Regions:
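Active-site loop/oxyanion-hole signature of alpha/beta-hydrolase fold enzymes
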Residues: 32-33, 42-83, 98, 243
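Short beta-strand/loop motif that positions the catalytic acidic residue
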Residues: 191, 197-199
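Acidic catalytic loop of the alpha/beta-hydrolase fold
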Residues: 202-206
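Gly/Ala-rich beta-loop-alpha elbow adjacent to hydrolase catalytic centers
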Residues: 84-88, 92
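Catalytic histidine-centered segment of alpha/beta-hydrolase-like enzymes
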Residues: 229-238, 242
């Protein structure tokens, strides 16, 4: 199997960052710059996405989780802090289910425990249908705009454009299938790790009920809400986001 792209910067206790749908390693650039000053930051690009666009994509959240755990095994990383954004939040929940004792602290960012994502701006199946009807170019410009309050006028929107340059329709559809078929709600009670949940109150991908479900069911969790932010809080309120995460993991 072709190796995926993994950026690995800084020294210290590892922080693993897992991007979401149509994301990339580069989309964590502001976090890499900040956190690499005091910890080792590992940011894979998921198979088929971003810098790993030439790798064969997966249609299973569990397989994505296993792939990242495999990367960490190769790097001989035993314990780590773990953050996942959106679909990446599903992946980190699955990683914690498989290897929870290795996760020091968990950060579930703009995510939920139900892959179908109740309350999303459209159903996963609708996105799949539009993807097939409209193709990648239209879909890849339509969906990421919804992740920012300012849409494609946000200063960091270019990261979304970069991320999708070489992503195929099959990869995009496989990830939608993976999300649609995944659920982690029954496992939330088994997550004992200290957990930070982050959400922007204008997020149209995940509504409050989704993050509240995480908060109510994960025993050692706390929820932090960013006002007037959408789905990409880490790109909309970079400094506040980074400080919040730093205070949590240190």
């Amino acid at each position: 199997m072709k190796k995926i792209y993994v950026d690995d910067v800084g020294k210290g206790f590892p922080l693993v960052l897992v991007h979401g749908y149509l994301g990339s390693s580069e989309m964590w650039c502001h976090q890499k710059d900040y956190f690499s000053k005091f910890c080792r930051v590992i940011t894979p690009a998921l198979p088929g996405f971003g810098e790993s666009s030439n790798s064969i994509s997966f249609d299973s959240i569990k397989n994505m989780a296993l792939k990242i755990l495999e990367v960490l095994e190769e790097k001989k990383i035993e314990k780590f802090n773990l953050m996942g954004h959106s679909m990446g939040g599903m992946i980190v929940q699955e990683m914690t289910k498989i290897a929870g004792s290795r996760v020091n602290k968990l950060i579930c960012f703009a995510t939920g425990s139900i892959g179908e994502i109740p309350g999303r701006f459209e159903t996963i199946e609708e996105t799949r249908e539009k993807l097939k009807k409209d193709g990648t170019k239209i879909t890849f410009s339509r969906v990421p705009k919804k992740w920012f309050i300012k849409g494609d006028q946000d200063n960091n929107y270019y990261l979304c454009k970069n991320a999708v340059k070489n992503v195929t329709l099959e990869t995009a559809d496989n990830a939608l299938i993976a999300m649609k078929n995944w659920t982690g709600i029954d496992n939330l009670k088994n997550i004992k790790n200290d957990t930070l949940i982050i959400w922007g109150n204008k997020d149209t991908s995940y509504n409050f009920d989704q993050v509240e479900t995480l908060n109510k069911n994960i025993e050692n969790s706390k929820l932090e809400i960013f006002e007037n932010c959408s789905h990409n809080v880490h790109l909309e309120e970079v400094e506040k986001f980074n400080i919040l995460v730093k205070d949590f993991i240190h």
